[in-house]
């Protein structure tokens, strides 16, 4: 189109040749936080993602590299999956700094006979967001309080913990 080429997912993935269950990915793809972000909406029970997910991750995709580790299917731990990666942290927008965000998820998923499956996971996000002003807000008790950071252009810590079950 007149604005150039656009894409949703563009990455290279290298799978391990032995188990074909672990891989290294680099490019633009879904972040490994929670259950909903990693899956297409066609695979979810509702047509839209939860509002809280859309708030924290307005564009589900980000530029980064991720390692996925899984054991062989014959292992007693084959139901576990670890995804961990470094991401630009600004979705699919232009990169503005050299800081990277760490996102990881340890998940478990197992079939229940032929009719269903269960899953659970723990996610962690650690990164920074640029603050172009001298002001910031921090939580004190059950409300936000304005705080003077002293200088313009500081980076604020961005840290999320997540639990999911399905």
Give the ranges of each region predicted by the language model.
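Outer membrane beta-barrel
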Residues: 1-92, 96-103, 107-114, 119-124
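Surface-exposed beta-loop-beta
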Residues: 90-166
């Amino acid at each position: 189109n007149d604005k150039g080429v656009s894409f949703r997912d563009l990455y290279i993935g290298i799978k391990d040749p032995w188990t074909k269950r672990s891989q290294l990915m680099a490019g633009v793809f879904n972040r490994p936080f929670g259950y909903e972000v990693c899956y297409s909406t066609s695979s979810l029970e509702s047509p839209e993602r939860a509002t809280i997910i859309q708030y924290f991750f307005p564009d589900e995709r980000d530029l980064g590299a991720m390692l996925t580790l899984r054991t062989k299917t014959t292992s007693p731990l084959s139901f576990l999956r670890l995804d961990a990666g470094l991401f630009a942290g600004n979705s699919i927008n232009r990169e503005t700094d050299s800081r990277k965000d760490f996102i990881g998820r340890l998940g478990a998923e197992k079939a229940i006979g032929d009719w269903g499956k269960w899953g659970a996971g723990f996610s962690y996000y650690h990164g920074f967001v640029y603050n172009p002003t001298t002001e910031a807000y921090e939580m004190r008790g059950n409300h936000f309080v304005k705080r003077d950071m002293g200088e313009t252009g500081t980076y604020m810590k961005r840290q999320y913990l997540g639990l999911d079950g399905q």
